[in-house]
Amino acid sequence: MALSVNTNQPALIALQNLNRTNDDMQAVQTRINTGEAISTAKDTAAVWSHRPGAGDMSGLAREDEPGSGDIDRGRGPRAGESVSDLLKLMREKVVAAKDTSLTTTSRQALNADFQGLIKNLNQVLRSATFDGANLLDGSQAADMSFLADADAGQAITLTLQNLSLGGTINTLTATDDILDPVNAAGVLTRLDATLSAVNQAVGNIGTQAKQIDAHNTFVAKLNDVLETGVGNLVDADLAKESARLQALQVKQPLGAQALSIANGAPQIILSLFKGG
């Protein structure tokens, strides 16, 4: 190779190699620090678009929908079951009130218990309210729908049930009393029909709640699969990166030494003119 004081090609090549080593070391250190193989879109655009968060499916989980967490955890079904239990207790009071041999005091005591159970029933219905909606008291104008796919093209619908007093399911009223055997007999007839209808309504709510819960489970598993797939694309292999870093740490001083040697090459020209 010709020696020249104007152009030092070996030094330029050595500098390029050293710069490349420094860039590689910076890239390796970034991957180690972030844990990601892809840190910017310019690295690999197609893979960068799948970085964590880009394909998040959590929006489909029913727990992220208003009120759905309360439904699939059983608030609606549990409230309905409580209504059914209260109706059974009321039935015991009504059956006892049909006894014609009861004293007035005993009958009044039974009626007081009956009225207290009606108040408890209303309280249970009010407790089924969440996020401004109530599944059981008939105050909600329309059924509740929840997003079921990423394109918002499908929904899971929860059919509401009206278990409030004086409705089509619960025909009891707040003014009912069991102060005499005749009233008690009439209340018992409506109460038996109400109990059957309430149990059916609660069963429907439970079935739909299971559907929502199953959807939650499916979305959670799907999210895990997506997260694993994305991780395979963007996560850095730290074992490999550690090996690369050690190699570059050796390569970097060697490159600096090569550049130093190349920079000193023009000095050889001076020796050609000495001792003449």
Swiss-Prot record:
Subcellular location: Secreted; Bacterial flagellum
Biased composition (Basic and acidic residues): 61-75
InterPro entries documented for this protein: Flagellin (IPR001492), Flagellin_C (IPR046358), Flagellin_N (IPR001029)
Top-rank lineage group of the source organism: Bacteria
Principal cellular location given in the protein's record: secreted
Gene Ontology annotations for the cellular component aspect, listed alphabetically: bacterial-type flagellum; extracellular region
Pfam families per UniProt: Flagellin_C (PF00700), Flagellin_N (PF00669)
Region Disordered, residue ranges: 51-80
An annotated Gene Ontology molecular function: structural molecule activity
Annotated keywords: Bacterial flagellum, Secreted
Record's subunit section: In C.crescentus, the flagellar filament is composed of multiple flagellins of 29 kDa; 27 kDa and 25 kDa.
Family, similarity comment: Belongs to the bacterial flagellin family.
Biological function: Flagellin is the subunit protein which polymerizes to form the filaments of bacterial flagella.
Protein name listed in UniProt: Flagellin FljJ
Organism: Caulobacter vibrioides (strain ATCC 19089 / CIP 103742 / CB 15) (Caulobacter crescentus)
Upper lineage: Bacteria, Pseudomonadati, Pseudomonadota, Alphaproteobacteria, Caulobacterales
Gene field: fljJ
